[in-house]
Amino acid sequence: MELIVSILWLAITAENLANTLATNYCNLQSCKRNNAIHTMCQYTSPTPGPMCLEYSNVGFTDAEKDAIVNKHNELRQRVASGKEMRGTNGPQPPAVKMPNLTWDPELATIAQRWANQCTFEHDACRNVERFAVGQNIAATSSSGKNKSTPNEMILLWYNEVKDFDNRWISSFPSDDNILMKVGHYTQIVWAKTTKIGCGRIMFKEPDNWTKHYLVCNYGPAGNVLGAPIYEIKK
């Protein structure tokens, strides 16, 4: 049984890698409609870019990937089960359904390609042929050997729940100020999102501090204006 599972996992991984290699990201219609250049088209080299000084810790081990997925799913289930007590007007209500996320190598490849530019902003287009893709980014700086773990940075996103009004659950608001305050949290708990892939890099800043940069891509994308974040369990 273990051999069969291993073979199946390798087959799925190979298929996802083939999808990444086969996709013509420069002709992706979902990018063209917004006059945006896809990250994989704009940055064809997998090598970190010129902004990445003395870079290290590029990408993740399998154990780190599992930890990222598990932390996301732990937080999603906290909300789905009605155990999140924070919010601007009370606890977050439970969800009818909020499936666990799984790691997606194509999303991870695109996230890593963007992280490798060492530019702390969202990329213009990261969609794949299967669906539109959302994104969370985080960066911390340190002067010594201490470094932020991915899970600590994920919690920075999730903790936006303290500013979240549960009346927004049924229809994601169009107010950009709200998106700026809680958009990382809502992407984490967006019920229709099922895939995640992340990239990571550390590099030196001009002031000699070390920047820790995390990019996570999600599909299908959350934060769709007017759409429900999840269905509330009555």
From Swiss-Prot:
Any one Pfam family match given in the protein's UniProt record, by short name: CAP
Principal localisation: secreted
Disulfide bridge partners, by residue number: 26-41, 31-125, 52-118, 198-216
Keyword flag Nucleotide-binding: no
Tissues in which the protein is found: Expressed by the venom gland.
InterPro entries reported for this sequence: Allrgn_V5/Tpx1_CS (IPR018244), CAP_dom (IPR014044), CAP_sf (IPR035940), CRISP-related (IPR001283), P14a_insect (IPR034763), V5_allergen-like (IPR002413)
A cellular component annotation (GO) from this entry: extracellular region
Protein origin, superkingdom: Eukaryota
Domain SCP: 69-218
Region annotation (Disordered) ranges: 80-99
Secretion signal, residue range per the UniProt entry: 1-22
Cited SUPFAM superfamilies: PR-1-like (SSF55797)
UniProt keyword Amino-acid biosynthesis, yes or no: no
Localisation per UniProt entry: Secreted
Entry keyword set: Allergen, Disulfide bond, Secreted, Signal
Similarity field: Belongs to the CRISP family.
UniProt name for this protein: Venom allergen 3
Protein's organism: Solenopsis invicta (Red imported fire ant)
Species classification: Eukaryota, Metazoa, Ecdysozoa, Arthropoda, Hexapoda
